[in-house]
Amino acid sequence: MIHVQGLEFGYTRSRKVFRGLGLELGQGSIMGLLGRNGEGKTTLLKLLTGQLLRQSGQLEVLGHDPKRRQVSFLQQVYLLPEEVVVPSISIAKFFEVNGAFYPSYDAALGHELLQIFSLSPEMNLKKISQGQKKKALIAFALALRVPLLLMDEPTNGLDIPSKSEFRRVLAQYTSDEQTIIISTHQVRDLEQIIDSVLVLEQGEIICQATVSEV
């Protein structure tokens, strides 16, 4: 699923985020990606999806090199960023337009998840609250049913009941064939649903273990 060896990346020559990072991750698990601000969590997610390009080393995801950004690869991965600039359109139109890029997109599931989150498809994404927008985007991400789903701080901006809904839908509406990586500072929000954790510190993996081992 994911193979990383000797990965190097820096935003400038003097600011290296990763120096020789190595990582192996198999298929079909929910992993919590942990670490303080500035440790490289978001950078790693973007490298895995081809939004940033490694400077050296090996990186293989789903049998593809993300650096090549092949359509067949991009259709199988999705990164839900912490912050998303949304257009002034309805949730339904956003789902329709963006879901068309993913062959695995399940429109019926998307609408079912909106109901669970108490959202109407006709709501304008620009005019709803931050928490509502976050839930709409989570519903879209899960409805894509991609083999590799990455989420950057998905519970930020959610109230306690919404966090419970998030845990429930993640457990209920993901399959054993999917691999999900969730970057978070709030591990207590996810400890009941994640299978393993990976902890980054100063651009290095200091812990990779199952939840039972931690």
Residue ranges of predicted features:
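Catalytic Walker B motif of ABC-type/P-loop ATPase nucleotide-binding domains
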Residues: 149-153
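Helix-to-loop junction immediately C-terminal to a conserved catalytic motif
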Residues: 49
